[in-house]
C-alpha cells in the first residue's frame, strides 16, 4: 500500500513538473509580396499577392520542424517575391488579362496565402495550424487549414494521430460524438430541425462520415476541424466541433485529456 501511494505521489510530481514546462512564444514572421501588371477595372494597379508566414516558438526542436515544413530553409522577402513573380499561373493570368481588357472584360488578380502558425500548446504538446488558401479568379477562394499536434522536448517530433490518442477500439464512439455535434451545428446554422440535419448528413456523406485526423487541444476538451466541402457544402464553411472532456472519458487516453486542462491558445 505504501509503495502504491509513493508511486502515485511520484507520478503526480512528474506531471506537476511538466505543467511548469517553459512557455512557447507566439511570435511569427509574415512576408507579403505583390506582382503588378496593368490596371484593374477602377484604373488602379492590378496586383497579384502572396502571403507567407511562419512561427518562431523559441523551442529549438519545434523551430527546426517549422524550418523543415518550409522546405528546409526559412523564406525571406526576396524569396517570396521571386516565387510570386516566377509563378506560372501568375504569368498565364497576366496574358489572359490582356485579352480580357481587349474584350472589355474584367481582369483578375490572384491571391495566395501560405502560412504556418503556433495555435497553442500544453505542457507536453504544441499545436500548429497551416493555412493554404488561394483565389484563382473563380466564384470564391478555396483553401485548407491543417492542424498538427507535436510532442514537445524531442528532436524530429512526429504528428500525433487519432490512433495515438484513442483508447483501443474507441474510434466509432468518437465518430458518433462528432456526428452528433455536427447535427447540432446544422440545426443552429441552418435553422432547420434535427430530422432534416440528419438527412443532410446522409445525403452528403453517405455512410462515409468519420472522425477527422484534423484535431487539436482545447481548454474544454478536443476540437475537430473539417475542411470546406469535406462533410458539407461550401456555405457551411469549415465546421469545427469541440467535444467536452466529460464526453471523451473512456474514449481518449486519460493523459491526453489531462493535457487539455492546461491548453494555452494564441490570444
What is each stretch, according to the model?
Residues 8-16:
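Bacterial N-terminal signal peptides
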Amino acid at each position: 500500500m505504501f509503495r502504491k501511494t509513493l508511486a502515485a505521489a511520484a507520478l503526480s510530481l512528474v506531471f506537476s513538473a511538466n505543467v511548469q514546462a517553459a512557455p512557447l512564444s507566439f511570435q511569427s514572421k509574415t512576408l507579403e509580396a505583390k506582382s503588378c501588371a496593368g490596371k484593374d477595372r477602377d484604373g488602379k494597379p492590378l496586383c497579384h499577392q502572396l502571403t507567407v508566414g511562419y512561427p518562431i516558438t523559441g523551442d529549438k526542436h519545434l523551430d527546426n520542424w517549422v524550418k523543415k515544413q518550409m522546405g528546409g530553409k526559412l523564406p525571406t522577402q526576396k524569396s517570396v517575391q521571386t516565387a510570386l513573380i516566377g509563378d506560372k499561373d501568375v504569368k498565364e493570368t497576366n496574358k489572359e488579362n490582356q485579352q480580357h481588357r481587349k474584350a472589355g472584360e474584367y481582369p483578375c488578380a490572384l491571391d495566395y496565402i501560405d502560412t504556418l502558425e503556433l495555435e497553442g500548446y500544453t505542457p507536453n504538446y504544441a499545436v500548429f495550424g497551416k493555412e493554404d488558401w488561394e483565389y484563382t479568379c473563380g466564384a470564391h477562394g478555396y483553401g485548407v487549414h491543417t492542424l498538427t499536434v507535436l510532442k514537445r522536448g524531442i528532436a524530429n517530433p512526429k504528428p500525433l494521430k487519432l490512433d495515438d490518442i484513442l483508447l483501443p477500439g474507441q474510434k466509432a464512439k468518437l465518430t458518433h460524438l462528432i456526428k452528433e455535434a455536427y447535427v447540432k451545428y446544422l440545426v443552429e446554422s441552418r435553422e432547420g430541425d434535427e430530422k432534416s440535419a440528419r438527412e443532410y448528413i446522409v445525403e452528403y456523406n453517405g455512410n462515409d462520415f468519420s472522425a477527422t485526423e484534423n484535431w487539436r487541444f482545447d481548454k474544454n476538451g478536443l476540437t475537430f476541424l473539417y475542411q470546406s466541402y469535406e462533410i458539407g457544402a461550401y456555405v457551411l464553411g469549415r465546421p469545427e466541433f469541440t467535444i467536452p472532456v466529460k464526453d471523451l472519458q473512456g474514449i481518449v487516453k486519460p493523459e491526453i485529456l489531462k493535457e487539455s486542462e492546461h491548453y494555452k491558445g494564441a490570444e
